[in-house]
Amino acid sequence: MNFPSGAVMPEQLPSSRATARAMVMPLALAQFIASYAATNMNVAIGAIAKDLGTTVSGVQTAITLFTLTMAALMIPGSKLTDIWGRKRCFVVGLSVYAAGGLLAALSTGLPLLVAGYSLLEGIGSALMIPPIYILVTVSFPDVKSRARYFGVISGAGGLGAAAGPLIGGLVTSAISWRASFGLQVLVVAWIMVLARKVIDPARSGPTPRFDLTGAALSAAGLFFVVLGLLQSRTYGFAKSRQDFAIGGTVVIPEGSVSPVWLYVAIGALFLVWFFLHVRSSEKKGRDVLLPLRLFRDKVANLGLGTQTVQWLILQGSFFVVSVYLQEVNHDSPIQTGLMLTPATIGILAASAAAGRFARRHPQRWLIIAGFLVAAIGLVLLLVLVRAHAGAWRWVPGLLLFGTGIGTMLTSSVNVVQSSFPDRDQGEISGLSRSVSNLGSSLGTALVGSVLVAVKLPEGKPFAVALIMLLVITLTGLVIAVLIPQVTARTGQC
């Protein structure tokens, strides 16, 4: 039998379910720890600021820089998998991440915290996350197996994000915020031991050249776009809540258009420049960071659209509920983390069932069903917010919302990754992760702006924010309906 260029030979694939599980375990743990790192710091801000003799805003800046570093370097990091190899890139990312965690744990001031957490952990995440999804895609050729193991990884990521505030809060309260970083280092060390069982199917064809200019342009573009979205917490999304100054000179006065749009516009210009560079390079036959052919696939484009909406409503809803519970119900961060547990259970349960779902239903219908269930969950949460309901009444809405998210997250990733041959997995994986990061940032930016801008009695702004998220969820449902019924590569959608 002849195999097409870029195909994986059968002898390179996991030969049994036990082998497959041994391979997926370190990948899932890596996704867990990356998601954990993105959320656990929020409950330790005060303790870190006091211990390091810095300000709360300084620690918040470190958290922002972590997000920016990871978002900006995700696409270049994914391209390196084609040059270094997927497993090698994964292990290098783990090593850089562990070094960052150790430096952060031992930091004596804000500069070392930024170097360890913001930069090294951010770079490590950008290197280790893309290989996770590439390795699953190239190692499991059929859509049902991919769904099963993407479900495991999505569940691990959801658990890490949800458990971050809870575990981080408990560790910080019981021991120290430094112990939280130490815990990450230990987990990463364990992952590196387990990673020896990861199979990296050989990639056919010549090793591509790294497009340094494209990497710089894409990183700058994503950096400024995400920075703008994150700055909405300070300045607001539409109108600026305070003066925006550069070098002591007020550039945008309070009440004018928010500087968020200045950052986003700068980022958009860099991204336009990036795409012009890619088009010019492709015409000259040069290797590029992100081939334009990736954007000509209708299924993948719609799948990326659903991913954006999913992460937007996930982060946006968690943000709304978290702020509501702490500001209106006066719950502690740890209590808030416990209150979000039903959503986490829903995500985990649906992700664990992804393989069984994929055997019975097309991926397209799973995405549609996920949006419908998530919308019902949001409606229940909206009713509870308006009624100022007690704690236990939040369970059904959060459980349904989490179940909907878990159902469609795995399917959307599967649809996007399965739309391309093995030779394009590095690029599409980085693009997919970048889109997810943008969705997450946009979710908190939009919700934060609504909560500040809406001048209504206690609890009403939260209802408005949930209504906005419900409308966006229904928009995602429309996008999912537009996904074609069948694709040539996966055989189903």
Question: Where are the regions that the model predicts?
Answer:
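Multi-pass alpha-helical transporter architecture, strongest
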Residues: A195-R196, V278, M468-C493
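Hydrophobic transmembrane-helix bundles of small-molecule transporters
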Residues: A174-G305, L469-L470
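Membrane-interface helix termini in secondary transporters
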Residues: A47-A49, S78-K79, I83, L170, ...
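Helix-loop-helix hairpins in multi-pass membrane proteins, especially solute transporters
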Residues: D82-G214, D422, G426
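Intrinsic disorder in cytosolic terminal tails and internal cytosolic loops
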Residues: M1-T19, S204, I483-C493
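Transmembrane core module of solute transporters
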Residues: A20-T69, S176, G255-L262, K283-V413, ...
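A generic transmembrane-helix signature of 12-TM secondary carrier transporters
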Residues: Q31, L94, G100-G101, G116-Y117, ...
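A late C-terminal transmembrane helix in Major Facilitator Superfamily
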Residues: S419-K455
